[in-house]
Amino acid sequence: NCKASKEEIAKSLEGSWAEDHLFELEQAFDLYNFIQEQVNKCDRQIEMHLIRYRAKLDHPSDDNFQRCKKKIGKKNAVDFDVEKYAFDIWKVNIMAIPGMSAISLLQLIGELGHNFADKFETCHSFCSWLNLVPNNKVSGGKLLSSKVPKKTNICGQVFRLCANSLKRNKTTLGYYFRRIQSRCGYSQAIVATAHKIAKIFFTMIKNRTEYDESETGINERDLLERKITMTQRRLDKLNRQLEVALV
């Protein structure tokens, strides 16, 4: 953020400028404006397709839309209400899921459509299609290997990007990411959190239920209290063993 006023900026530009430098600056400014104009045209075209797609759906009008309260970045954001369009298509506010962005919503709408949940029997089959479920190889009741197959799925990549944005997030999903990262590593945390987001996404749309953070897992405070309780029990056990040894 620029802290200087317009007057200060204008005054700092006063001076003797070479003609070729001014020409280069003018060219760069014109190019920037041209690119912004093309981006705005793309936004309008995308919105036009969303309007047409929404009109084809046999969905009754719903006035129960409630905008999520999380902060949404405005840098390079589209200039139309993606959150409302997604709600009109899926009838739940997917933007409420931590890590979900307007760009992610647009990609999921374009790749999945409105009735994708009917094409998967279970949430597990959907996550498996996203390539977010490890391919467990079991022999004789023993787990030999558990790796996620190396195949590309665009929607799966979207959920991975959503998971990556939760590294410092203070929601339960953010705590979940950091807990898995401390135990298994960064890559495993990305896949595990993306899997969890995908399950929430599918369940919300399949059951037409809004996002409920209380059902996504324990928060960091509860986890800390559990660790304190377990540590206290271990200390008590050690104290008892020490008392027996000293007798």
Where are the language model's segments positioned?
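A detector of single, family-specific signature residues
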Residues: N1-V247
